[in-house]
């Protein structure tokens, strides 16, 4: 068997990659995160919107994987094929930043969890925590350098291991669930700080996106799949599995403790919910599960970060140095660039801990990472819609075209809703992070002797720059904060 064929990923590994990417730290903090924004009624409405929106997005990724198998790189490739080089670059850049910002947040949460057992790690932002996080970062880095397939196998093992505590949590809370607690204040009327039901639903949206980031994981690795048809299957199977886990964890928690009680919990709040039911050993169980979960999620996202930059560099949308692979067919330069950025921001976390805004480093990274991935998701959904409108690949399949048109239309509407729900603040902060990427885009274009921007791309870039300038001034003046 050749080295290339031995690196191919089967359906099980691809599905584990999707599940492993989505089940990181988010689900373990879900009870408090949701209760801080919404009560039971709004939570149920929000999950219904999320289920429909994210399922249509999963179906779009499945359809694109089947109908456009020649496109490698997922969100990046779809944006480029549909809307040009700069949109493709922007999707790659935004996805990449989202991924490694999420990794920084995961490192902080991991050592914050260890702080439950070893106070020296505090909330994940002490000297000891940053030093140990750095050691772990580079250990994962060199593991991935040994080969994509080897790391994917380890991810499969950690995915299975971390799901067990989640099922135990669900089973125990199912028996501890009390209907009178669940229905005590369905619409949150006793807590005016939550606002209207519409505001509650809107405020919980970024959290739902955060816990679903990774749904596109299999499509990013489409070029390494043993069967291209497995990419779509892995996306949908992974989505349904994670959706069930998320909804059960969230809803059952609200039948064990009230919304005000959940909102006041420290994270990982799932550990404290189980401790409330069964005692100290419950918190230990969930904390161990979280540690395994975070290690698996970090491994998944280290892989995804490098792969998206590598895919963009292969066709000259990113500079040439990012497409170089080592002897194990790993995009080594992309991996080095990614983890250097993570290392820098781990140091930044230490120096920005205790900011007067009161927001912890993990939450800041969560919100920024989520806002950065909204644009790549939008362009992927829009490309699915574009194919159906043009009839491309549907020449003899009118019925499928009509079905996919509806699905892609819903996915686009959902993506636009997410941009609205995220709010102007995070749209401007995203522009501030998107704008500097044009330097790499210009370098890549210079390497192949092409003009940097063409046509409408100039207007889009101008809008990004204006948004970035407004954000920069806002941070300076104080009307915007991270």
UniProtKB/Swiss-Prot annotation:
- Residues on the Periplasmic side? 32-40, 122-124, 178-202, 257-283, 355-365, 425, 480-482
Any Pfam family the entry gives:
AA_permease_2
Q: Look up and give the membrane topology term.
A: Multi-pass membrane protein
Q: Which reaction does it catalyse?
A: L-ornithine(in) + L-arginine(out) = L-ornithine(out) + L-arginine(in)
The source's superkingdom equals Bacteria
Key words of the record: Amino-acid transport, Antiport, Cell inner membrane, Cell membrane, Membrane, Symport, Transmembrane, Transmembrane helix, Transport
Parts of the chain on the Cytoplasmic side:
1-10, 62-100, 146-156, 224-235, 305-333, 387-403, 447-458
Q: Please provide, alphabetically and separated by semicolons, the GO molecular function terms listed in this UniProt record.
A: arginine:ornithine antiporter activity; symporter activity
User: Which residue ranges traverse the bilayer?
Assistant: 11-31, 41-61, 101-121, 125-145, 157-177, 203-223, 236-256, 284-304, 334-354, 366-386, 404-424, 426-446, 459-479
The alphabetized list of GO BP terms reads: arginine deiminase pathway; L-arginine transmembrane transport
Q: What happens when the gene is disrupted?
A: Mutant is unable to utilize extracellular arginine as an energy source under oxygen-limiting or anaerobic conditions.
Residue span of the signal peptide, if any? none
Transmembrane among the record's keywords? yes
Location comes to: Cell inner membrane
GO CC, sorted alphabetically, is:
plasma membrane
Q: Which Gene3D superfamilies match?
A: Amino acid/polyamine transporter I
UniProt lists the family membership as follows: Belongs to the amino acid-polyamine-organocation (APC) superfamily. Basic amino acid/polyamine antiporter (APA) (TC 2.A.3.2) family.
The protein's job, in short, is: Catalyzes electroneutral exchange between arginine and ornithine to allow high-efficiency energy conversion in the arginine deiminase pathway. Also mediates the proton motive force-driven uptake of arginine and ornithine, but the exchange is several orders of magnitude faster than the proton motive force-driven transport.
Q: What's the protein here called? A: Arginine/ornithine antiporter
- What species is this protein from? Pseudomonas aeruginosa (strain ATCC 15692 / DSM 22644 / CIP 104116 / JCM 14847 / LMG 12228 / 1C / PRS 101 / PAO1)
